[in-house]
Amino acid sequence: MMTATATRTNRIPTLENGAAQLLLEIADGDVDMDRIVQLVQISPSIAAKLLSTANSAWSNPVRPVTSVTDACSRLGLNVVRTTTIALAIGQSFDPKRCPAFDAERFWCTSILASRLASELAPRFGVDPNTAATAALLNNIGMLWLADSMPEAMSAAFDCATADDGGNLSECLRESCGMDRREASQLLFSAWRLPEALTGAGADPQSPQRLIIDVAETMATEIYAETALDDATCAEDDNATTTVYTKISGELEKTQELAAILF
């Protein structure tokens, strides 16, 4: 398996020109909308997606949106930041090569995790934008595995859903030679993205890592429309429950956004 893993690292896709810089700047909490518009216009594909989204039933504009500036204004800073980061990364992969991979579910839970991390971050003394970006990118390795190893990825999903199967991480290591977090770290390293932005390599007990893990678990529970597991709650149960309830109310809208974008 390790030989296969080493071979696969040679197939890591490159980011679109300017995508790495776009990620760094848009993830900065101090970036304003004018600068985001400038960055988005560097990438015609991202600009087109934002325009399409701003003109969709999801956005429900009163009149046609015809400029990137108006599209960003219509969608709002948080939506533009999240979708631009997701598109900058996501366009490097074709997860449809793996029919078992549910792209809508992946992006919906990733966006929910990003929103949750942003809400939880202040309680841990972590910058909300940094936490949101790290949570959004946490499982990006899944896209790479679905694109580059579709058959192995399908086998991992079959393993994880079997009655006597293991958890997904174990099944991914068995079928693909690495789990989703290891795959993500390989991408971050190859793309030279800073650890502060991705959460990769962070101490498992660090505030940022804890936020990412809790946000991911909560996002999965929200997507499944289940009650918040007590084990998921941090020290302040009431605050965590409040965040969970708030973001749960965004599920339908987030599902629609993920379907439009991906």
Region locations from a protein language model:
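Terminal helices and disordered tails flanking the catalytic cores of nucleotide-processing hydrolases
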Residues: 1-4, 234-262
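Conserved alpha-helical "signature site"
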Residues: 1-157, 161-164, 168-230, 262
